[in-house]
Amino acid sequence: MLNRDHVAAPAVMLLASLHGELANRIRAVVEEWPIPPKLVGLFGSAARRDGDARSDIDVLVVTDDPALDDRVDDLAELIRRWTGNRAQVVGRTPADVARLVRAKEPIVSEWTRDLIVIVGERTALGKAA
């Protein structure tokens, strides 16, 4: 149990909430995009919370935005600046996701198993959800 009177308590509480803060920052950025994404979520070690200081942060973005590549690159850079970790932001259109689901690509299993939804709906993963 945390002694909230301890001088280090605010720092401990801040460290404990880093995962939520990252999700909040990602949400704030993508909510400013002119075309709202269908789905944005953390997956991999960032979602499972079993990564370390060297782990990358995996983010899935599903959108019809024609500027998808630029949005993904910009978000990856922001995440790197916020965390110090490399970000692997995977941008896919809904059609891409449907094709990956039909092909039973292994990454789809990881998404359905680990994904923490930040924005949108898990149903954007189609039949894999």
For each feature predicted by the language model, list its residue ranges.
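Active-site glycine-centered loops adjacent to acidic/histidine catalytic or metal-binding residues
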Residues: 44
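Catalytic core of pol beta-like nucleotidyltransferases
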Residues: 1-38, 48-54, 63-129
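Acidic active-site catalytic centers that drive phospho-/nucleotidyl reactions
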Residues: 56-58
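Phosphate-binding active sites in nucleotide-utilizing proteins
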Residues: 41, 60
